[in-house]
Regions:
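Short, glycine/acidic-enriched loop or turn micro-motifs at the edges of active sites
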Residues: 34, 59, 181, 198, ...
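SAM-dependent nucleic-acid methyltransferase catalytic core
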Residues: 1-17, 71-193, 197-202
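Glycine/threonine-rich flexible loop motifs
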Residues: 203-207
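Short, structured coil segments at secondary-structure junctions
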Residues: 48, 170, 247-250
């Protein structure tokens, strides 16, 4: 099992760096900022007998997971229809297909069932640009990411992976609300992974995620740690001492990383290259 879609800020590439800090044992797993779910995949493989509580404030993203869990047959029927129409097309025709479908998703989604809407968004995410979530005035405040390379050969999505997710999600409680809503599910020996929008990235689905919200995440980490949970929070170090000054008894670990999806710096000659940055992991271990 692997993440269902590419996701800017996804944790697939960071898992090896995190390996020495992840808990060996936990009874439940809680992820308040689910996104693409790479950390959930790790947790499920680590302990499939655990219970799982997954949240994201983005209702459209959560509808994809809910549809795969509860209505995978109709989800795949809709997805397969798009795939069959899309694959025979030339690249210019695929681009036209993508933008027409994106427009339908933006303005005419009321005609679809919740599952059809979710499958449509999933298709757009699989054919859109680099796992980036954008909204703009031309898409009614809904998914507005440009098309991707559109170079799929024989399939747009991985059927077996969707079915693995269908099975795994049967063990999951899925919610879409504020990230603090997870508190009611936390128990001693829960593993909670906090992956808020990074400092310097400015937005969470078009809403400014400012330092006041970052402080709420740090408070949540401290509260959960005090309750006996294993807690980890990822973020970006922008060099102003923000996390160091609020570290308390928590551990801070630093990682040098290179961003390739949507965070490319412009060179003096006008070209673009991958942007180097420093990420942090704040770790609060329980004492039970």
């Amino acid at each position: 099992m692997k993440p269902l879609f590419m996701w800017a800020g996804g944790k697939n590439k960071m898992l090896k760096k995190y390996a020495n800090y992840l808990p060996e044992q936990f009874d439940s797993y809680i992820e308040p900022f689910l996104g693409g779910g790479a950390m959930f995949v790790w947790a499920y493989k680590k302990n499939p007998e655990a219970t799982f509580f997954l949240n994201d404030v983005n209702e459209d993203i959560m509808r994809i997971y809910q549809s795969i869990r509860n209505d995978v047959g109709n989800f795949l029927t809709t997805l397969d229809k798009y795939q069959e129409d899309f694959l025979p097309l030339s690249k210019p025709e695929r681009k036209k297909f993508y933008y027409a479908l994106r427009q339908e998703h933006a303005y005419n989604y009321q005609k679809w069932t919740a599952t059809e809407e979710a499958a449509t968004l999933y298709f757009l995410m699989k054919t859109g640009f680099n796992g980036i979530w954008q909204i703009n005035k031309n898409t009614n405040g809904r998914f507005g990411t440009p098309s991707g390379l559109l170079n799929q050969k024989d399939k747009v999505y991985d059927y077996d992976n969707v079915m693995e997710w269908h099975e795994a999600l049967q063990k999951c409680t899925l919610i879409s609300g504020d990230f603090t809503d997870c508190l009611e599910y936390a128990q001693p020996n829960s593993f909670v992974f906090l992956d808020p929008p990074y400092r310097g990235s400015f937005t969470q689905y078009g809403v400014f995620f400012d330092d006041t919200l970052q402080l709420r995440v740090i408070k949540l980490l401290n509260d959960l740690t005090s309750a006996g949970c294993h807690v980890m929070m990822s973020n970006r170090d922008v060099g102003d001492g923000f996390f160091e000054s609020r570290q308390g008894d928590n551990d801070l670990v630093y990682f040098d990383v290179t961003y390739t999806a949507g965070r490319r710096k412009k060179n003096t000659d006008g070209t673009h290259s991958a942007k180097k940055a420093r990420e942090i992991l704040m770790i609060g271990e329980h004492n039970g």
